[in-house]
Amino acid sequence: MLSVVEGIFIFVVISESVFGVLGNGFIGLVNCIDCAKNKLSTIGFILTGLAISRIFLIWVIITDGFIQIFSPDIYASGNLIEYISYIWVIGNQSSMWFATSLSIFYFLKIANFSNYIFLWLKSRTNMVLPFMMAFLLISSLLNFAHIVKILNDHKMKNDTVWHLNMYKSEYFIKQILLNLGVIFFFTLSLITCVLLIISLWRHNRQMQSNVTGLRDSNTEAHVKAMKVLISFIILFILYFIGMALEISRFTVPENKLLLMFGMTTTAIYPWGHSFILILGNSKLKQASLRVLQQLKCCEKRKKSQSHI
């Protein structure tokens, strides 16, 4: 029987999951419509992949968490935890792959540096970005092969209880190794964000020396992109904290509250960033406003029909 606090956490997690599926589903739907019209751009492809991978990631988070809460004995026998681990790695890595590609895209499109290499990359963004995405994908696949080896080696050492018989130090070391790809993507995103902030600061300093003091459209683009990237960093830090809490829960399996708090913190990232992307992207924002207007019109029609 769940306590009141645990029930609240379950409600919050389910609400976050619903919002996450709706937000990411909306992003994917808008870009799929553009794809059907042969209007899908590079940013549209990245956003579509990011939305799909995050929906997948949300379902993995919920499935894994609910199994640990309501049926923890399932993980003590059989190969379910192995399959969940593989699915988790695929969803996590693919989500971070697209998120890092999005960060690089904003950096190349908006940042402004006088460095020759950067200018060369910036002038060839549409050509360079696919190569960078391919490089990130290859590194992700290589890391996945390493993860498979870790999981197989660990399974051979633990025939009866797959996860819980491990020493704490060994367990945490293996978790770090399993998340090396995510750490790499996060570091790369952080670097692009910092460089973009530096570019924005320099541009604002130049604008302040101007007599008018007005911000041009380029500065507005810098600010919008910086908000998106900074929000991504903040949400992803929360995502890391949530994962750490869920991982720590295996050392104290009787503490369900710690797991629920970890799930709540982890689920903030895939749904929160999707709504920030909708508000930060003019096409997605306009599409969302049209949907809201249509919903309001439908509500008014229902009210008028009920009065007749």
From Swiss-Prot:
Residue spans crossing the bilayer: 7-27, 43-63, 101-121, 127-147, 180-200, 228-248, 258-278
Extracellular side: 1-6, 64-100, 148-179, 249-257
Residues carrying a glycan: N92, N158
Keyword Transmembrane helix: yes
Principal location listed in the UniProt entry: membrane
Pfam family membership, one: TAS2R
Key words of the record: G-protein coupled receptor, Glycoprotein, Membrane, Receptor, Sensory transduction, Taste, Transducer, Transmembrane, Transmembrane helix
Recorded GO CC terms: plasma membrane
Cellular compartments annotated: Membrane
Cytoplasmic side: 28-42, 122-126, 201-227, 279-308
Topology of the protein relative to the lipid bilayer: Multi-pass membrane protein
GO terms for MF: bitter taste receptor activity; G protein-coupled receptor activity
InterPro entries registered for this protein in UniProt: TAS2R (IPR007960)
Lineage top rank: taxon: Eukaryota
Cross-referenced SUPFAM superfamilies: Family A G protein-coupled receptor-like
Coiled coil found in the keyword field: no
Similarity comment text for this entry: Belongs to the G-protein coupled receptor T2R family.
Record's function text: Receptor that may play a role in the perception of bitterness and is gustducin-linked. May play a role in sensing the chemical composition of the gastrointestinal content. The activity of this receptor may stimulate alpha gustducin, mediate PLC-beta-2 activation and lead to the gating of TRPM5.
Additional remark text: Most taste cells may be activated by a limited number of bitter compounds; individual taste cells can discriminate among bitter stimuli.
Protein name: Taste receptor type 2 member 10
Organism listed in the record: Pongo pygmaeus (Bornean orangutan)
Gene: TAS2R10
